[in-house]
Amino acid sequence: MRIFLSFIFFLFFSNSFAIEKLENAHAISMHGSPKYSKNFKNFDYVNFDAPKGGSIKLHQIGSFDTLNNFILKGSPVVNLSQVHDSLLTQSFDEPFTMYGLVAESISVPEDRSWVIFKIRKEAKFHDGNPIRVEDVIWTLNTLKEKGHPFFKFYYGNVKTAEKISDNEVKFIFQGERNLELPLIIGQMKILSKKYWEDKFENVLLESPVGSGPYRVKNFKAGRTIEFERVDDYWGKNLSVNKGRFNFQKVIIEYFRDATVALEAFKSGDYDFRQENQAKRWSNAYNFTAIKNGHVKKESVKHEIPTGMQGFFINTRKEIFKDRVVRKALNYAFDFEWTNKILFFDQYKRTGSFFSNSDLAASDLPSKEELELLDPFKNQLPNEIFNTIYENPINDGSGDLRKNLRIADKLLYEAGWIIKDGKRINESTGMPLKFTILLVSPEFERIALPYARNLKKIGIETKVRTVDSAQYERRLEDFSFDMTVVSLGQSLSPGNEQKDFWSSTTAQINGSRNYAGVSSPAVDFLIDEVIAAKNRESLISATRALDRVLLWGYYVVPHWHIQNFRIAYWDKFGQPKINPKYDLGLDTWWYDNDKIKLLEP
C-alpha cells in the first residue's frame, strides 16, 4: 500500500476513561479527551505567524508513472496526501485524536456503532465545486469496490454510508466492536466524484482535482513533480491548519541512485534530506557546506514506535512452512557484527513488532495476556507462555560459529540434513535454497554477508536487486522468497493489523501480509486489538499479538533508531516545539534572512 496514511500515535490512558457519547463535537479521541478545546487557536508545535512563501526542494529514490495512488496499478508519486483533504486531521503531540477538517462536527453514540459528520459549507475542491455528501459516499464505495485491495479490508466494517441531510453523512458500522472506526473513516481522503468518476481505475498523468492545501502544478513522470500552495485554499484559516503548509512551492526530484542523490544535495540541487543509512551519516556529511554552517546536520529525537524492519520470510513457500526452519534462519544473521562494522554502532536490534513503545512484549505474559492466549495453547509454541523472546546474540567479532551450530541442530531436528555440502530435506530430497529480493543495491552489503553465513550451513542463498517498479509488483503478488520490509506501527494499532497478519489477507494480492501469516490465534488477537475498550486492554491484546508473531519467526528482525537523522540547507525557520510523533516538516517556513547569508 503506497498511499499510506500518516501514522497515528497514542500515549498512556488508564482503564478509568470511558467512551463518551459525542454530539456535534469538534474532535474525537480513541480514549480520553482531546487536548485542544473547541475554539483553540493552533497546535502547540506550530508558529501561528509563520510567513508564507518560498520553496522547499525534496528528493525521492525511485520513479513514478501515475498521480493516482488509490489503485494497485502503477507506481504513484509521493506527497499526494496534501492534495486531498480528509474529514478529520490528527494532531502529533497527543494521543490518537482527530480534529475536524472537512467535517465541521462529529457525533457518535457510546458504542461507536455509527458516526455522523457534518460537512463544512465552505469546503470545496480546487475547481470551485463544493465538497458534497455525495462525494463522501461515492469515495467510500469506490475505494472499497475498485480501489487498492487495502481499502476493502481497512473499511470492511463500514456497512453503509447514508446521506441524512444536505451536509450530513452517516456511516454505519458492522462486525465486532471497533471503537477506532469513526477515526479511521475520518482519515479517508475525499475525492471529487465529478472529476474521478471516469478516471478512477486508470493510471493518471495529469494534475488531479483535489481539495487540500496544495495542487500539482507540473511534473515530468519519473523525474520531478512540483506542488504549489493553493492561495484560495478553503481551509487555510482553520485552527488545525494555522502555521502549516507555509511553502509556496514543494518540489520533489526523483533519483534512481542514492549516491547520486546525495551528491546532488551537496551541490544544493535540493534542500532537505532524511538520512536512512548509518554509514553515510557517519562518513558522508563532512563536505564544505557542513563545515561552514550552510548545511545543518541534526539528530531529532522522537517518540514514534519504530515497528519492524527485517528479512520477511514468505511462508507461502513450501521450504518456509516449518517454524523451526524459520527460527534457524535468525541464528545465521550476525547483527552485532553488522552494527559494529557497517553501522558504527548506531542501532539497536529490534525485538518486537511494536518496538519503542509500551505495546512491545518485553516481559513474561501478564494474567490478562494469558487469558487471551490460553484458548490457543495447543496451537502455539510453549515458549510464548514461559519465555521472554530474545534474538540470538553474538560478540561482534564476526565469528558466528556458535550460532551456526545452533542453526544446524535446529535444521536437523526439522528433517533438513547435509548431503554433499547442501542442505536438503531428508524425506523429499528438496534442497533448502532461496533468493533474497532487494530494491536497493545499498542493502546488498547487509544481505550478502547473511547469505554467506547461510551457505556455511548448506543453504544456497542468492541476492537479487531489481528496480522499484518490479519490486513493487513482486511484493504485490508475493513473488519472492525473502525480502526486506519495514512495517511501521502506531501507538494505536487497529484495522491495519488485518492487512499485516490476517488469514484473510494472506492470499490477497496487494495486501501487506508479506509473510503470509495465517493463524487462528493471530486472527483472534487482531480482533481483540481492534475491539479494545481502553488503553489497558489494548496493551494486553497487542502484547499477546506481538508474542505470537515473534515466536512464529516470520521475520529475521533487523534494527531501529529512535531519532530522525536530517540534513538541510540553512534557509528555513522552525517552530520552537517539535511534535512528539512526527518530523513536522509542514510547519517549517522559508526564511529570507537566512537565504541572504547563503548568498556568495
Report the location of each language-model feature:
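Extracellular/periplasmic solute-recognition and catalytic clefts
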Residues: 160-163, 217-228, 253-317, 324-328, ...
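Ligand/substrate-recognition segments at binding pockets and active sites
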Residues: 40, 274, 383-489
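Gly/Pro-rich hinge or "lid" segments in bacterial periplasmic/extracellular proteins
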Residues: 63, 83-94, 185-249, 256-260, ...
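Ligand-site clamp/hinge motif
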Residues: 120, 202, 235-285, 327, ...
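Detector for C-terminal structural segments
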Residues: 22, 60-62, 75-78, 82, ...
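Surface-exposed binding/hinge segments that line
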Residues: 118, 152-197, 201, 211-220, ...
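Aromatic- and charge-enriched surface segment that lines or borders ligand/interaction sites
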Residues: 46, 50, 71-79, 105-149, ...
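N-terminal lobe/hinge region of extracytoplasmic solute-binding protein
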Residues: 20-111, 118, 141, 145, ...
